[in-house]
From Swiss-Prot:
Name of the protein described by the UniProt record: Histidine biosynthesis bifunctional protein HisIE
Sorted UniProt keywords: Amino-acid biosynthesis, ATP-binding, Cytoplasm, Histidine biosynthesis, Hydrolase, Multifunctional enzyme, Nucleotide-binding
Region described as Phosphoribosyl-ATP pyrophosphohydrolase: spans on this chain: 117-205
Enzymatic reactions: 1-(5-phospho-beta-D-ribosyl)-ATP + H2O = 1-(5-phospho-beta-D-ribosyl)-5'-AMP + diphosphate + H(+); 1-(5-phospho-beta-D-ribosyl)-5'-AMP + H2O = 1-(5-phospho-beta-D-ribosyl)-5-[(5-phospho-beta-D-ribosylamino)methylideneamino]imidazole-4-carboxamide
């Protein structure tokens, strides 16, 4: 293992980054023992500077963080825990991540581009589960899988036509429709977009 550079208190900052969405969930600190426990158990452990003790994230709240990988920065004085966040909340306030405000104190409402597809699939699943009356997605799904797949095919054809016409704005618009219906198709098929991304990673060279 690399020789980490701890501060004068024997701590090192740790960023928890979501494996599925790529978003930064939280920032905390760990000492050598907390890192050891993380590696041994596969679940995120940190060191509480206020309580002066090691704590397992989610031990009481159930918001556990399964650690997929631990990464070290170039100066070896900071870590990233690449995690799968249980209950989809990381912040003690109930927010999905601890960075939910901008520098002016306003709540950040929109995800970053790389978060969009997995976050959008979460919204789609919620609409399907709730069977919302005014939801286009819920209405589409209520017509059956075949109709969902047909709609995806229609949007794919419209995207292809836009590409052939070479009109950038139309391509972007139609691609968004296609991706949305693709996510609906995956959702009704019980497939997470993460699994598609993992297949792309497998092919990455």
């Amino acid at each position: 293992m690399l020789k980490l550079k701890f501060n004068e208190e024997g701590l090192i900052p740790v960023i928890a980054q979501d494996y599925r969405t790529g978003e930064v969930r939280m920032l905390a600190y760990a000492n050598e023992e907390a890192i050891k426990k993380t590696l041994e158990t596969g679940y995120a452990h940190y060191y509480s500077r206020s309580r002066k003790k090691i704590w397992k994230k989610g031990e009481t709240s159930g918001e556990l963080q399964k650690v997929i990988e631990v990464r070290v920065d170039c100066d070896e004085d900071a870590l990233i825990y690449v995690i799968e966040q249980e209950k989809d909340r990381a912040c003690h306030t109930g927010e999905r991540n601890c960075f939910f405000r901008d520098i002016e104190g306003n709540k950040v409402e929109k995800p970053l581009p790389f978060e969009v597809l997995p976050r959008l699939q979460d919204v789609i699943r919620e609409k399907i589960e709730r069977k919302e009356e005014n939801s286009y997605t819920a209405k589409l799904v209520s017509q059956g899988k075949e109709r969902v797949f047909q709609k995806f095919g229609e949007e794919a054809v419209e995207t292809l036509i836009a590409l052939m016409k070479g009109e950038k704005e139309e391509v972007i618009y139609e691609s968004a429709d296609m991706l949305y219906t693709f996510l609906v198709s995956l959702s009704v098929s019980g497939i997470d977009i993460k699994e598609v991304m993992e297949e792309l990673i497998r092919r990455f060279k």
